[in-house]
Curated annotation (Swiss-Prot):
Role description: Photosystem II (PSII) is a light-driven water:plastoquinone oxidoreductase that uses light energy to abstract electrons from H(2)O, generating O(2) and a proton gradient subsequently used for ATP formation. It consists of a core antenna complex that captures photons, and an electron transfer chain that converts photonic excitation into a charge separation. The D1/D2 (PsbA/PsbD) reaction center heterodimer binds P680, the primary electron donor of PSII as well as several subsequent electron acceptors. D2 is needed for assembly of a stable PSII complex.
Gene Ontology BP annotations: photosynthetic electron transport in photosystem II
Domain of life assignment: Bacteria
GO cellular component, one term: photosystem II
Cofactor note as given: The D1/D2 heterodimer binds P680, chlorophylls that are the primary electron donor of PSII, and subsequent electron acceptors. It shares a non-heme iron and each subunit binds pheophytin, quinone, additional chlorophylls, carotenoids and lipids. There is also a Cl(-1) ion associated with D1 and D2, which is required for oxygen evolution. The PSII complex binds additional chlorophylls, carotenoids and specific lipids.
Family under the similarity heading: Belongs to the reaction center PufL/M/PsbA/D family.
Organism for this UniProt entry: Nostoc sp. (strain PCC 7120 / SAG 25.82 / UTEX 2576)
Name of the protein this chain belongs to: Photosystem II D2 protein
Name of the encoding gene: psbD1
EC number: 1.10.3.9
Segments passing through the bilayer: 39-59, 123-139, 151-164, 206-226, 277-293
Predominant location: membrane
Pfam families registered for this protein in UniProt: Photo_RC
Length: 351
């Protein structure tokens, strides 16, 4: 027997910190937690502060806080004024100059919440990568979570960066998001954009697949227990499978004539559909940031302008979009002092 005698390698501060971050505890921290927890705390705290106390009078001419009488559906952390451009509006920057009240008035909370929120979401994705590596599984959860991150970054950051200022980004609130949706439709005809169509197909298709999958598994359970209902019938730690893939395959083969042949392909498809849809919608929003057009059926517009009896759903939607632009712009951008004479407002079938 050989005995090797030597000195244990010294552990530096990095090794000690690595052990502490990855220690098994109720809430795992990890290296990703250094980014996730502070950013998530500051983003959520900034949003709660803004919706509780901070007005949007100086940026949008609106009341947007509980203090002013708004409710949960109408409060918001509003985007900065158009005149601020793409400034980060740092508290110590030239705009606020360290004055917290002035910073609130200028809309400084919006870039604060947007940037910390984006980095918080990225930190959560990295958390899934990190834990997957430690547990020894594939990182597809992190890959899936990249889709909502792409949508958030494209809508809240890429779109306003392509426009004249942060003002045109959605404010952080329920009714504020609805206003932004109307804006996208009126100024970009977003619902006719093929990337939006792919996004809708992905989200609704993912919901459909989720419902079908859950129902099929429930339908093909073959090992029941003594519980009064499905939710009480199983031991949550049982190792064996309790539903029949073969029976499910036979059922859907009779319904559609085709069915998934194995679970890997089935679950990959359930991952692929919503993730691809969200990614495509994010690509479409980046296109809107650059003011790219999708489908413009000019021939129908010209014919509708010449022939009062010719109208399609497309030309009708174009008129509705013109109405949104004409009536929304003065309300949405009061600082521009838009005035639309009566004769230029859309009326009837005339484009």
């Amino acid at each position: 027997m050989t005995i090797a005698v030597g000195r244990a390698p010294s552990r530096g501060w990095f090794d000690v910190l690595d052990d502490w971050l990855k220690r098994d505890r109720f809430v795992f921290v990890g290296w990703s937690g250094i980014l996730l927890f502070p950013c998530a705390f500051l983003a959520l705290g900034g949003w709660l502060t803004g919706t509780t106390f901070v007005t949007s009078w100086y940026t949008h001419g609106l009341a947007s806080s509980y203090l002013e009488g708004a409710n949960f559906l109408t409060v918001a952390v509003s985007s900065p004024a158009d005149s601020m451009g793409h400034s980060l509006l740092l508290l110590w920057g030239p705009e606020a100059q360290g004055d917290l009240t002035r910073w609130f008035q200028l809309g400084g909370l919006w870039p604060f919440v947007a940037l910390h929120g984006a980095f918080g979401l990225i930190g959560f994705m990295l958390r899934q990568f990190e834990i997957a590596r430690l547990v020894g599984i594939r990182p597809y959860n992190a890959l899936a979570f990249s889709a909502p991150i792409a949508v958030f970054v494209s809508v809240f950051l890429m779109y306003p960066l392509g426009q004249s200022s942060w003002f045109f980004a959605p404010s952080f609130g329920v009714a504020a998001i609805f206003r932004f949706l109307l804006f996208l439709q009126g100024f970009h005809n977003w619902t006719l954009n093929p990337f939006h169509m792919m996004g809708v197909a992905g989200v609704l298709g993912g919901a459909l697949l989720c419902a079908i999958h859950g129902a099929t598994v429930e339908n093909t359970l073959f090992e029941d227990g003594e519980g009064a209902n499905t939710f009480r019938a199983f031991n949550p730690t049982q190792s064996e499978e309790t539903y029949s893939m073969v029976t499910a395959n036979r059922f859907w083969s009779q319904i559609f004539g085709i069915a998934f042949s194995n679970k890997r392909w089935l679950h990959f498809f359930m991952l692929f559909v919503p993730v691809t849809g969200l990614w495509m919608s994010a690509v479409g929003i980046v296109g809107l940031a650059l003011n790219l057009r999708a489908y413009d059926f000019v021939s129908q517009e010209l014919r509708a302008a010449e022939d009062p009896e010719f109208e399609t759903f497309y030309t009708k939607n174009i008129l509705l979009n013109e109405g949104i632009r004409a009536w929304m712009a003065p309300q949405d951008q009061p600082h521009e002092k838009f005035v639309f004479p009566e004769e230029v407002l859309p009326r009837g079938n005339a484009l």
